[in-house]
Amino acid sequence: MAEHKVGTREEWQSARDELAKLEGEQAERNEEIKKKRLELPWVEVEKEYEFDTEDGKKTLAELFDGRSQLLAYNVMFGPDYENGACPGCTMLADELSGGLVHLNHRDVTLICFSRAPIERLIAYKKRMGWEFPYVSTYDNDFAFDFGLAMTKEQAKQIPEVQEMLADPPEWLDEWSDQVGAKLEDALGENPSWIAFARENGTVYHTYTVSAPDPFVAPYSSFLLDRTPKEQPAEPRAWRKDEYPD
């Protein structure tokens, strides 16, 4: 006998109809939020940035690769991470390559940023089998200027970060071991999506969203939300070549 509540088909349909109303309300709310997102003012990027890429140095405008929109995920992979990128960020990045062709044909270039040196990014990308362009922000202030990373001084001003450092939960200590960095160094990276537009040769910052927003979670998390069994509140993430089984 299943531990979960078992009912008749009629009971299931009644409960499903009730849930559908809530899901419909959420969908309407999501459309309202989407409209507000598109209405955000654009901010011109006046500072010049130079990035290390697999093809040499590039400016922010050159990262668009001829398209008018740039969407980037900031993978937590700081200069102090000795064991590679954050496993959770790695899970999300694993799911991006298949969407490249579809985004490119819709005038969007998709890339990932990290603060580790480009040589380490290239090696990690090869290990994971990723296909998207991987760009290093190691030699510039881009990550700090756009909130993709924070200095230790900035971290001291954030109560949530200080609470985690003062009394880290077990999963956070395990995560720190996985990335191979002291917790105070590891938490300096901010998993985020960031978007830019390019019009008439000018680049504009248009949007940023960071954890714990659900959009920063791997898509597999949304799939797991539709499965019968509830997932742990803080499930441990694994790189795909490190699962213990």
Model-predicted segments: where are they?
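Catalytic nucleophile loop
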Residues: N104-L121
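Non-globular targeting/processing and membrane-anchoring segments
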Residues: M1-R106, A123-G129, P133, N140-D245
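Residues at the C-termini of beta-strands that transition into short coil/loop
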Residues: S114, S136-Y138
